[in-house]
Amino acid sequence: MESTIILIIILTASVLGRANSVALATCFLLILKLLNADKFIFPYLQENGLFLGLVILIASILIPIADGKVSYISIRNVFTSWLGIFALLVSLFTTYLSGLGMNYLTIQGHSEIMPALILGAVIAAAFLGGVPVGPMITSGLIALGLKLFNKIGS
């Protein structure tokens, strides 16, 4: 019952904060709980959800290439402009951070920070015009900060 109340609070905050992806995901989980399907589906989602979500996200990012809207020349030009090089470097860094974050949340099991990540995403969507896609990068920054802090402290 407590988990349902927490999900309803997250749903309310995400609707008020216009964090539609968080609201939709929360509704999905609440429906699964109402149908008593959570005992079967939650373990599968917890094990495979990030991977499946990443596949869909990457496929949507690759569509311009698959549609022929990105040419070989455009890809080559990435390496000849300062903006292209900067975008490539930032992408390398954020992808690295996402990997750190995924490892931190899943393999290392630090799910206790998830409420703070969700709350931060909802607040940023509501008041800063943000889009709540950053929990992996956020947890990656946390993991990187902890790595640096541990190196400095030892």
Curated annotation (Swiss-Prot):
Annotated membrane topology: Multi-pass membrane protein
Cellular localization per UniProt: Cell membrane
Top-level taxon of the source organism: Bacteria
Keywords per UniProt: Cell membrane, Membrane, Transmembrane, Transmembrane helix
TM ranges: 5-25, 48-68, 82-102, 113-133
Any one cellular-component term (Gene Ontology): plasma membrane
Entry keyword annotation includes Lipid metabolism: no
Protein family (similarity comment): Belongs to the UPF0756 family.
Official protein name in the record: UPF0756 membrane protein CKR_1028
Organism: Clostridium kluyveri (strain NBRC 12016)
